[in-house]
Amino acid sequence: MDVSHGEADIGIRCGQGDWPGVNKTWLMDEEAVLVCSPRLVPPEKIACGDWLATQKLIHDDTPHPGANFPSWDDVLRTVNAPGALESRLHINSTSAVILSALSGRGVAIVRHALVKQLIETGQLVQLHPDHRWPLTWSYYLVTPQHTAMREEVKIFHDWLLHDVVSDNP
């Protein structure tokens, strides 16, 4: 649906916020994190570069234009896991990358907002929790630029804005 052409009254977009024809309200910034299935990693290895270097690395080949998404080389260098195995799985769907990590196929670099609840419920483990990679993408609430917001849309807009801000201080 194209909010800028009035096909929807409101939407949430992730990007750099440079969309024509919409009013935008910043919701939250995004960052990348390392995750895997809890079945894959012993608890004492969650922040261990040597353990990570032995794992299959899941690549999200989905385009992330302008997001400054970290490469595996950047991540491995940051967490001190040089000489990682070249065992890599390339997937061109972010949701399939997350499903692969959930099923124990390997370790993935993913957008935190997409897996936050899975981490909180223990379905995924965030590896190296002291390391996060800020992206240049943020989440925005968008509405058509030249259309007055209907009352029910305004109520939803305000509720969502309050809910997101209270969850992301």
How would you label these PLM feature ranges?
Residues T25, I98-L99, K154:
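Alpha-helical segments flanking ligand/cofactor-binding loops in enzyme cores
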Residues P42-P43, G66, I109, L118, ...:
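Loop/helix-junction capping segments adjacent to catalytic residues or to phosphate/diphosphate-binding pockets
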Residues M1, P129-D130:
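Short, solvent-exposed loop/turn elements at beta->coil junctions and helix N-caps
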